């Protein structure tokens, strides 16, 4: 995630430009007064950081924008950008504040984050609903990284408000952060992500008991490869000895119980039609199996049958005349959530 960590400030600078650059002891910083756009509402599942946040509390994320925030090198074009997103080659930079306390309508304490993007990016997400949904996920991830928390994805809402709170605190960030190569930083974070504790759940590469199912990022062979036993000794035997051994050879032992368990997916499919949008249909596919690995999606489309197949185990008949060109089907995979978004 290409997020920039910063701290909010209480004072606001009332000047016509809405932001001002000042000199700090360790370099120049920029103070940004974000412009409110919309609000994401969810709840806190858990917190692992030094701050003592209470599980189950409501969370509000103010999505805002400013012309000072960097934007991607490539301007948004659906046909160009969505394939780049799938390859982790395009992302909207997000300046994420630390959390602050507030109260909901019932007077209960809640947590608020601010996620600020470039003003051009704000216009892009208004024009493309798929990019908007992707940005929502990026904002959730950015807040999680910022304060070491886990946010709920099952009950996300969008209240009819521009912002949560009386005002949006100004943001302060080093100019070096604003002008750094965020793309290089994004790739570095992606590489580091492979070594985080979650990789144990995804691949269990460090567990000797799961060596039969490695997840090292490589594709399995097309045809089965015979297992080779290393360290076997070479001995000279005759044909009679071979026949004698074959007769006495015991049947192969039954596999251990954990080897018999199959990764059986449990798919939940939701469809939603859109009128007057760039896409006519959105299909949300989520794997609810508790032990399923995050990267077990392999979608394919049969134009003659007008059926969408997932891993060869799930078939989804599509409405007539909804697929004009199979190349126009857009797929976005949120790996950690084991969720597949398909836009037609």
From Swiss-Prot:
Residues 207-216 have a biased composition (Acidic residues). InterPro entries: PIH1/Kintoun_subfamily (IPR050734), Pih1_CS_Ascomycota (IPR041441), PIH1_N (IPR012981). The lineage of its organism: Eukaryota, Fungi, Dikarya, Ascomycota, Saccharomycotina. This is Protein interacting with Hsp90 1. GO terms for cellular component: cytoplasm; nucleus; R2TP complex; ribonucleoprotein complex. The keyword Metal-binding does not apply. Present with 2610 molecules/cell in log phase SD medium. Belongs to the PIH1 family. Its main location: cytoplasm. It holds the Pfam family PIH1. Residues 195-222 are annotated as: Disordered. Keywords: Cytoplasm, mRNA processing, mRNA splicing, Nucleus. It comes from Saccharomyces cerevisiae (strain ATCC 204508 / S288c) (Baker's yeast). It is found in: Cytoplasm; Nucleus. One of its GO terms (biological process) is RNA splicing. The gene is PIH1. It comes from the Eukaryota. Component of the R2TP complex composed at least of RVB1, RVB2, TAH1 and PIH1. Also interacts with HSP90, RRP43, NOP53 and NOP58. Involved in pre-rRNA processing and required for the NOP58-snoRNA interaction.
